[in-house]
Amino acid sequence: FQPNAALPYEFNGGCYASPLTEDFPVMYYRTDIFEELGLTPPKTWEEFYEVVSVLQHNNMTAGVPNMQEDDTTGMSVYTAMYAILLSQMGGSYMKDDLTATYFDSPEGVEAFKMWTGFYSMYGLPYQFDFFNRFRTGEMPLGFAAYTIYNKLAMSAPEIKGMWEMLPIPGLENSDGSIRNQTVSGGMAMLMLKNTENPEQAWDFMDWFSGDEAQVSYGLAIESLLGAAGRYNPANRNAFLRLPWSVKQQQNLLEQWDKCVYLPQVPGGYFIDRNLTNAFRQVVIMNKNPRETLLDYNKEINQEISRKRKEFHLD
């Protein structure tokens, strides 16, 4: 597994699940349309804005996901987008002791301004079906989970060979390197506390999450379903043995190595809810980004504090 892959399942010194699958956002672009317009895929956000300008002048647009949720991972894509920008700016999602969010930090505020600015300043759509718009060419650039590859490979044969997936854009350092972290989510295995056969259950979990079982499972699914069944194991060794092309594998590994994992805390359900509320207030109601984020951040942290008291964690 990746070094911090179990972080979402850890709390207060305990680990409550074992990673099974993993998914993270990458950048998709239509190579045919980019070639026609003389564009190159953006590596930084400045380049992204330049590409968006050209696309919009040609009655096209780009897709930055907002209020959607990926059913296969349960990962909230809008939370992911904010967390991506926050990580790239060097900020933290939570304080070190996990007692409060860090959205009121300078990096947190700047990331929120940038996130909402995609829609309020650059006019990008905040509700869209990326698969269909990407297929038709209306949205030849966008960010989505790498498992969307399965759907594109199976259900969009008319654009086969006309698209690629790359790491997402980032912020450029003074030395020319790019900070393009993304966030990862996935599914996990767990054992119930009152299981009758804990040793046998653990043996199964240990076996099924191992290299050979994960490779066999992934290849078996793909042999039945074709590319639509391409498996996304959290086991890195198993991933390396699945039938990705060399270029696809290199691009995915480059992004995977820069994945950030978000901790889960009691009251964490208030994070998604209030980030969404703050987003709507700014993008739809034209409220001030900084003041709006700080107001909703207080509500988030009040709920986290309330749940910590309820569970006697303080």
Task: Report each predicted region and the residues it spans.
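Extracytoplasmic/periplasmic solute-binding protein
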Residues: L7-L20, P25, Y49-A100, M139-L141
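Glycine-centered hinge/linker elements that transmit conformational signals in sensory
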Residues: V51-V54, D96-Y126, I168-L171
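Short amphipathic alpha-helical coupling segments at ligand-binding clamshell hinges
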Residues: E107-M114, M187, E196-F208, S216, ...
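Paired acidic/hydrophobic, glycine-rich loop segments that form the ligand-binding mouth/hinge
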Residues: P140-A145, E164
